[in-house]
Amino acid sequence: MSKAGVTEGNESQIKFLESLTAFTKEHRARHWEGTFAAFLEDVLPRDTQRLTRNSHQYVWDMLRRSGAKEVGAQDQMSSYQLFADELFGIDDALERVSDYFKAASAGSEVGRRLLLLLGPPSGGKSTMVILLKRGLEEYSHTEEGALYAIKGCPIKESPLHLIPHTLRGTFRETYGVEISGELCPYCRVRLEQEFAGDFMKFPVHRIFISEAGREGIGTYAPHDPATADIADLVGSVDLSKVSKYGDEGDPRAWSWSGAVYAASRGVLEMIEILKVKREFLYLLLTLTQEKNVKVSRFPLIYLDETILAHTNLAEFHKFLQEKENEALLDRMVIVRVPYTLSYKEEARIYTKLISAAPHFRETHLDPHALRVAAVFAILTRLHKSEREGLDLSKKVRLYAHEEVEGISSSEVDRIRAETPEEGMSGVSPRFVINALSKAITRSEARSLTSMEVLLALKDAIESDARMEAKQKRQWLDFLVVVRKDFYNHWVKEDVHKALFASFEQEAQTLLEKYLDEVEAMLDHREIVDPITGETRPPDERFLRSVEEKIHISESGKLSFRQEVVRKAMVAYKQGTKFSLDSHARLHEAIEQYLFEERRDVLRLVTSSKRPDEEAKQKISAVQRRMVEEYGYDEHSAKEALNYVTTLLSQE
């Protein structure tokens, strides 16, 4: 290795070490330990409101601190930074989860219900819970997220539980906050045995939420129902300590290892909750409603925690079939977490998943490879609409916030509401990534084209033994739709732009000409020729030749033109230039117009069996431009050019 390489390696290592040091400084929280008297004197007065938060309020404050885009009134958030780099296209579900915590933190009845995330596999439920847990861990290391507990308490309870009920009214008058909760049996015994009832001497310390350390985060995964033991949730007698304390009813002889105790002051994750025994469910729902659990030999144990549960559709439908479960459903807040219905967001999911895989990092993907896979995935998740003229391809574009003729963006929410089950079934991201992985292992070129992706998906569908023949045929038909309605347009546009280097400027000039002609037509005035100075009427033939490229009818041309002028006026008032990106459908029309004008040139250059030297140079220049400007490599650029040549020969 060269000295330069060694130096660069050393510099990157030094930078990494510096980033670690900076991280520890940023996240190093001030540890604190003292008596309850010192806590009341030194710590509590600093921020009484924050230090008396319940678990729902704590999670809500963490979410707000993580950062969000404001969309209106205070605390009305749309997209939290906590989820920004991991979850894509499920903003509605994230909004409902945040609404749950906002309402619960305000003291509404919502806080007395269990939060259940319901959705298909690989839809983001587990990731959402993981991110919430990681957010809580980090938040607890900040001064804003400081948590204090009775030292040695098995449930990390608030030190304020030490204050007797007879004095809590005075506490409320002094500090302006209520104390909720009772001292746990373990600390009650310690108070008498170790401190002779003098609660002011009880030790208190700052705690930090940690899933690995079982502090503030508990997790329960279902076992075989025949062997599942409720002790996994609430603990059991520790026989090794019974001989020491002489009584199974002594709290010190109890094993406080249950998941509900680990989750105290934070969150309890219940994985596949509907698979657990009904007695487990009743215990959890009582805990959610009353903040108490009852175990043998002890009085009610107060626990302040938020239960985050998730399950899949199959288990949920099975659960619904049992009539005795209706009462349980009333005590849950169910948030649906569907697959995303935007192919652009779906492609972002694939980008995230493949970035962690070494064999993907070593393979070039053409610029549309992930997009064609994403469009296919979305098609499998959609339901046919009863609206006339709204096919699945148009739905795909609508849900990706693209313009579709005859449907305004304001109607999208209504269309979504007509088929609420969309996104709850269909292809999972995992299915697509597995298909891409197989395609990459077969590829010798270390390059994957969009057509190779479609073939890989075709193989995955045909070889899937779980799928019924009818579904296989439907999904194979979707691959044809992806190619015809989406990929063909994208790849032709790339080749066209690469062939005509001045395309962007020509398109902008054509846009300005269209706008001039439309404004003159709407104003009923003639246009002055800039060269001859003569006047002429607006060029209706030119206007229609552009509009027909996107199927604007004769009856619909006036409203389309008025819409274009209206958008141009908005851009003018905002001090911005009306460009191709200002109107997606007009952009498409102008591209198609230019493409038609140059079709013969393109066909001549790309389809010659024995190209002359000039044609070879043009082909080489097109391929080079596709590599340098449009995200292709040599292999995929050549394949794309050959594919477009085939398309042109068929037209």
Question: Where does each model-flagged region fall?
Answer:
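Long, basic/Gly/Ser/Thr-rich N-terminal segments
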Residues: 5-55
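Conserved ASCE/P-loop NTPase catalytic core
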Residues: 40-651
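Bacterial/eukaryotic Sec-type N-terminal signal peptides
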Residues: 1-3
